[in-house]
Amino acid sequence: GLAPIKVEGTLVEGGLKLNGSVSWASNLYPGGVIVLPVAVQNAPESHPNRYIVTVRQDVEGLSIDYHRNLLALNGTESGTLKFEDVFVPSEDVLSDNIEAFLHDVTAPFLLVQSSFCLGLAAGALQEAAKHLDVSQGVFRPEFPLILEEYQSLREELVRLASEPERAERRDLLSLRLGV
């Protein structure tokens, strides 16, 4: 399930007004777009009340408190978001049904994340292979096992990516955590 949504939306003419906060968000680069869930307070009774919206970082009413000097995380541009009467036009509502949206994007999202991680791992392994004799070769015996694990994860990624719509959530999460 989802954690409680801390940004509330109110349907207004032409879109939504947002109020609330997001304690931790990453990739808050200047000129960027933020995608977030919103709990809509006045949604029609027979209609879902949790939406997914996009907000431009320079929109009026949005303040960002950047978390600077985080060990190894400075490049993530992370921070806390505060929304005060931020207007989101109707065309910036990605979905008015968060469950359906998450169902549709979870597999591709986790597969892309896993691909990035495996690509990084492949580069690291390629470079590490050049230095197996450093420190009297202490890591040489482990290297084939690490390569085998990498290859297994890569094969699982290819298998899941061949039919993402059929991929089980458990398998996607296991792959993502494995890399």
Where are the language model's segments positioned?
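Glycine-rich flavin
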Residues: 1-26, 30
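A generic structural signal for well-ordered coil/turn residues at beta-strand boundaries
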Residues: 3-5, 30-32, 49, 58, ...
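A generic local secondary-structure boundary/capping motif
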Residues: 6-8, 22-26, 38-44, 68-73
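Short loop segments at secondary-structure junctions
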Residues: 12-13, 39-43, 57-60, 84-91
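C-terminal helix-coil-helix/basic helical segment that borders enzyme active sites and/or dimer interfaces
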Residues: 133, 154-179
